[in-house]
């Protein structure tokens, strides 16, 4: 039931976001806090959000910290649609075995749309595969 409510809020927020000008999500460093699985099976709370950040820069680049790695992608933002070009440079450090770096980057690269609600950023993945939930410090 909570996902139905979240889905309705996301749809309403998408409609409102499409009406806006420059997006409020640009220029903020967001910390990945959780993954919400639409099937409610693989929900995940990120134990150390400060190690998984996303900053959408004014110049169209995305600065990403994926635990022990730094990544730079480009992004396209059109209304509530958000997509990443995942071919940018990245460090290739070997993170700890329990790191979420690979999951984070794979899911981030599958972003389709976003919703900003009450200071929380939701990145909605393609094919209704779930949502990445971000807060700002």
Language-model regions, residue ranges each:
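Lipid interaction determinants
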Residues: 5-9, 14, 19-137
């Amino acid at each position: 039931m909570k996902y139905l409510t979240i889905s309705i809020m996301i749809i309403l927020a998408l409609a409102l976001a499409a009406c806006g000008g420059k997006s409020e999500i640009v220029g903020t460093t967001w910390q990945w806090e959780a993954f919400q699985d639409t099937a409610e099976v693989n929900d995940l709370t990120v134990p150390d959000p400060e190690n998984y950040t996303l900053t959408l820069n004014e110049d169209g680049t995305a600065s990403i910290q994926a635990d022990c790695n730094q990544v730079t992608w480009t992004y396209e933002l059109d209304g509530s649609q958000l997509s990443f070009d995942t071919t940018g440079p990245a460090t290739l450090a070997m993170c700890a075995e329990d790191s979420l770096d690979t999951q984070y980057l794979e899911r981030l690269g599958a972003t389709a749309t976003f919703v900003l609600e009450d200071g929380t950023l939701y990145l909605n993945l393609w094919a209704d595969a779930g949502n990445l939930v971000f807060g700002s410090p």
